[in-house]
Amino acid sequence: MAVYTDVAADELADFLSQYDLGELLSYKGIAEGVENSNFLLHTTKGSFILTLYEKRVAKNDLPFFLALMTHLAEHGVNCPLPVKGRDGEALRELSGRPAAIITFLEGVWPRKPNAAHCAGVGEGLARMHLAGANFAIRRANALSVAGWRPLFDAAASRADEVQPGLRAFLAAELDYLASGVWPTNLPEGVIHADLFNDNVFFLGDKLSGIIDFTFACNDMLAYDVAICLNAWCFEPDHSFNVTKARAFLNAYGRVRKLSEAEEAALPLLARGAAIRFLLTRLVDWLNVPPGALVRPKDPLEYVRKLRFHQSVSSVRDYGLMPSGLVA
């Protein structure tokens, strides 16, 4: 979450008059994250999150995100619910941006995830995958293989300013992933596609909610697993923590077992997930709007992660025995 667009108090008051949310007591911008402008609202009827959708989020995708949250909540996934106004609509406009209000979830995101957190995420992700199986609306993943080259092209001329040799490193990896090795026949469904630790809330070691579905789409379920290996199973020094990975994969597998083909593809999917976040971080790093209340994330973190995945030979390196759980 972040703030790119400021909202004046009188604009917000007019906006809230379209809802039955009580009187506004206070509001403040939320600085975390990099995609949209988010505000925490306190009213006489409770706390809510206001999101103004920016940058990569297309307005015609927003009904998908809002309907997905409603569907998942109705199928047992603890996630925010879109709030409808008096006219029955959840999506409207504020400060020239598409905007929506969602319910506030209790909990905090873990700054230092442990193995118990990773297990909670594994179980929660698997339950989300199962709950989304009969969701009728589809949205293609714009940030899969075909979307990586345009991101590279947008940043290539300045990539070596971030790290010497980065442009050539990225080009070589993109050439490999586009050479026909990317899987095409794995189980697909609705994926979160951005399940980092700041998008998962916990109360203690128990997962209390999953948030921020603005990258959700239809893609290989195992790709979502690979994203989480990148997001949850490395230490601050970027070394891979096999204990966390084992906890995550085992917990996922107890709810939804990975197929042999999914297991075999994990190293390749993890490489793809790593370069996807490396590229979007690189573009963001080079293009932060002046004065934005935002902290760009370090793209070089994902250079180190990608190099690790390039060295992986099988799922054993992730703590999982092929076609079976590790005790």
Swiss-Prot record:
Keywords: Amino-acid biosynthesis, ATP-binding, Kinase, Nucleotide-binding, Threonine biosynthesis, Transferase. It is an enzyme of class 2 (transferase). It holds the Pfam family APH. Pathway: Amino-acid biosynthesis; L-threonine biosynthesis; L-threonine from L-aspartate: step 4/5. PANTHER family: AMINOGLYCOSIDE PHOSPHOTRANSFERASE DOMAIN-CONTAINING PROTEIN, AMINOGLYCOSIDE PHOSPHOTRANSFERASE DOMAIN-CONTAINING PROTEIN-RELATED. Belongs to the pseudomonas-type ThrB family. NCBIfam families: PRK05231.1, thrB_alt. This is Homoserine kinase. It comes from Bradyrhizobium diazoefficiens (strain JCM 10833 / BCRC 13528 / IAM 13628 / NBRC 14792 / USDA 110). The lineage of its organism: Bacteria, Pseudomonadati, Pseudomonadota, Alphaproteobacteria, Hyphomicrobiales. The gene is thrB.
